[in-house]
Swiss-Prot record:
One GO term (biological process): mitochondrial electron transport, ubiquinol to cytochrome c
Cofactor note: Binds 2 heme b groups non-covalently.
Residues involved in heme b b566 binding: 98, 197
Mode of membrane association: Multi-pass membrane protein
Protein name as it appears in the record: Cytochrome b
InterPro entries: Cyt_b/b6_C, Cyt_b/b6_C_sf, Cyt_b/b6_N, Cytb/b6-like_sf, Cytochrome_b, Cytochrome_b_C_euk/bac, Cytochrome_b_N_euk/bac, Di-haem_cyt_TM
Length: 380
C-alpha cells in the first residue's frame, strides 16, 4: 500500500501532527478557541501591516501625511489601515481572554508554555507601543515621549539609556525610524516565539476544563476542532469588520488627528485602552522609579503564577472561593482600565491607588491563602 503523504512527508508530517491528527481532549470549551484566534490576528496584522508599510514614510515631516495619503489615495487604503488599527484591539482582547482562561483553568502549570506565553505578551505590548508612534500624531509623539522617558528612572544609566533609545536629545526623526524598524521586525519575532509556544504545548497536550489527565480519551483535532476554530474566526471577524467599517475611530484618540507638535502638550496624555490598566498602576505611585517598577511588575507577576499555585486541584471549576477571587480580580482590572483613562485628580488618584494595591494583593497574597484554605476544607 502506498504511504500516506500527509503522514510520511517531512513537512506535511509536522502540519499533520499539529493541526490534523493532533490528539485533543474532547471536552475543551470555547475558551480554548482564543489561541487559534490569536494566530489569525497575527496573520491579519502582518498582512495589513506589510501593505501599509509599502505606502508609509518613516520621516517626521512625511509620516503623518503618508498615513493620510494611504487612507485617501491608495486603493482600499482606508480599509487596510482601519483593519490594522482595530485588529490590534482585537489582538489584545483575544490575548487577555487567553491569559484569563489559562489563569482560571490552571494552564500555567505547563511552565514552559506559560512562560513563552508571557514573553509573547511582552513582545505584543512592545510591538503595539512602537506601532502607535508611527502615524506621528499628537498622542503618538507625546505617548512616545512619556513612556520612553520612564527609562530615565533607571539608576545611574537612566539618562544615557533614554538618549540611546531616542537617538538624540528628544523624540525626533531617529526615534521614528528605529520605531518603524522595530515595528516591522517584532511581529516576525512573535511568529517565531509562537512556534516555540506551540512546540511546548504539544509536548504535554492541551489542558481541559476539568484539569484532569485526558490521555485515555482524546479525539483528532480535524474535523472536530478545526471546524470549531472556523466558527471562532467568523465570530471574531464579524465584529472586527463591523468596527472597521462603521466606527473605525471609536477606540482611537482624537488628538491623533493633529500632527505631532513638540511645543504643544495634549491636556491628557493616555495610551490606547489595552494599556490603561498598566498606565493606572504606573500613575498611582508618586515616585518615578517606584511607578516604573510597579508597571513592570503588573505584567511580570504572571511569571509567578506557577509558583503561587497551592491548590491540590488544577482548575477553579470546583473551587467557588477561588472563582469569586478571580472575578474580583477581573472587576479590579476593569476599574484600573477606567481610572487610567481619567485625568489625574482627586477621586481618581485614590481609586487608582486602591485598585493597584488590590491587584497585587489578590494575585500575590489572597490567591495562595484561599487555595490553602480550600485544601483544608476539602481535607486534602
Amino acid at each position: 500500500m502506498a504511504p500516506n503523504l500527509r503522514k510520511s512527508h517531512p513537512l506535511l508530517k509536522m502540519v499533520n501532527n499539529s493541526l490534523i491528527d493532533l490528539p485533543t481532549p474532547p471536552n475543551i470549551s470555547a475558551w480554548w478557541n482564543f489561541g487559534s484566534l490569536l494566530g489569525i490576528c497575527l496573520l491579519t496584522q502582518i498582512l495589513t501591516g506589510l501593505l501599509l508599510a509599502a505606502h508609509y514614510t518613516a520621516d517626521t515631516t512625511l509620516a503623518f501625511s503618508s498615513v493620510a495619503h494611504t487612507c485617501r489615495n491608495v486603493q482600499y487604503g482606508w480599509l487596510i489601515r482601519n483593519l490594522h488599527a482595530n485588529g490590534a484591539s482585537f489582538f489584545f482582547i483575544c490575548i487577555y481572554f487567553h491569559i484569563g482562561r489559562g489563569f482560571y483553568y490552571g494552564s500555567y502549570l505547563y511552565k514552559e508554555t506559560w512562560n513563552t506565553g508571557v514573553i509573547l505578551l511582552l513582545s505584543l505590548m512592545a510591538t503595539a507601543f512602537v506601532g502607535y508612534v508611527l502615524p506621528w500624531g499628537q498622542m503618538s509623539f507625546w505617548g512616545a515621549t512619556v513612556i520612553t522617558n520612564l527609562f530615565s528612572a533607571v539608576p545611574y544609566i537612566g539618562q544615557t539609556l533614554v538618549e540611546w533609545a531616542w537617538g538624540g536629545f528628544s523624540v525626533d526623526n531617529p526615534t521614528l525610524t528605529r520605531f518603524f524598524t522595530l515595528h516591522f521586525l517584532l511581529p516576525f519575532m512573535i511568529a517565531g516565539i509562537t512556534l516555540i509556544h506551540l512546540t511546548f504545548l504539544h509536548e504535554s497536550g492541551s489542558n481541559n476544563p476539568l484539569g484532569i489527565v485526558s490521555n485515555c480519551d482524546k479525539i483528532p483535532f480535524h474535523p472536530y476542532f478545526s471546524l470549531k476554530d472556523i466558527l471562532g474566526f467568523t465570530l471574531m471577524i464579524l465584529p472586527l469588520t463591523t468596527l472597521a467599517l462603521f466606527s473605525p475611530n471609536l477606540l482611537g484618540d482624537p488628538e491623533n488627528f493633529t500632527p505631532a507638535n513638540p511645543l504643544v502638550t495634549p491636556p491628557h496624555i493616555k495610551p490606547e485602552w489595552y494599556f490603561l490598566f498598566a498606565y493606572a498602576i504606573l500613575r498611582s505611585i508618586p515616585n518615578k522609579l517606584g511607578g516604573v517598577l510597579a508597571l513592570a511588575a503588573s505584567v511580570l507577576v504572571l511569571f509567578l503564577c506557577p509558583l503561587l499555585h497551592k491548590s491540590k486541584q488544577r482548575t477553579m471549576t470546583f473551587r467557588p472561593l477561588s472563582q469569586l477571587l478571580f472575578w474580583l480580580l477581573t472587576a479590579n482590572l476593569f476599574i484600573l482600565t477606567w481610572v487610567g483613562s481619567q485625568p489625574v485628580e482627586h477621586p481618581f488618584i485614590i481609586i487608582g491607588q486602591l485598585a493597584s494595591i488590590t491587584y497585587f494583593m489578590i494575585i500575590l497574597i489572597l490567591f495562595p491563602l484561599i487555595r490553602t484554605l480550600e485544601n483544608k476544607m476539602l481535607k486534602y
